[in-house]
Amino acid sequence: MPRAKSSVVSRKRHKKILKLAKGYFGAKSKLFRVAKQQVMKSLMYAYRDRRARKREFRKLWITRINAAARMHGLTYSRMMNGLKKAGVEINRKMLADLAVNDKNAFAELVEIAKKNL
């Protein structure tokens, strides 16, 4: 019985990796071994940064809320404490959006927070 060669499977596997490596610089997009290493590293970065993105956005929202709250004479932590005591359940994403796009509504929320401190 002749030896079974895996040329079709190998070609398919190589094409799959090289397709994922498209756009990489130099040998990383041309040579299978180097491309495979870079694709593995890229997938690791993607996995890590999908989690980091959530932290980065939360930091951004908090920074925006803090800046807007300080313009009204309140710190971020005191504002959040006041809103919590008032029973206002609005998340940081929405608060940051209001701080940027609807300053009047944000000012009303600041007043609510001040009353409940």
Swiss-Prot record:
GO CC list: ribonucleoprotein complex; ribosome
Q: What is this protein called?
A: Large ribosomal subunit protein bL20
A matching Pfam family: Ribosomal_L20
Q: Does the keyword Ribosomal protein apply?
A: yes
Which GO molecular function entries does the Swiss-Prot or TrEMBL record give?
A: rRNA binding; structural constituent of ribosome
Q: Which domain of life is it from?
A: Bacteria
Q: Which UniProt keywords apply?
A: Ribonucleoprotein, Ribosomal protein, RNA-binding, rRNA-binding
Q: Does the entry feature the keyword Secreted, yes or no?
A: no
Similarity comment: family membership? Belongs to the bacterial ribosomal protein bL20 family.
CDD domains from the entry?
A: Ribosomal_L20 (cd07026)
GO-annotated biological processes: ribosomal large subunit assembly; translation
Role according to the record? Binds directly to 23S ribosomal RNA and is necessary for the in vitro assembly process of the 50S ribosomal subunit. It is not involved in the protein synthesizing functions of that subunit.
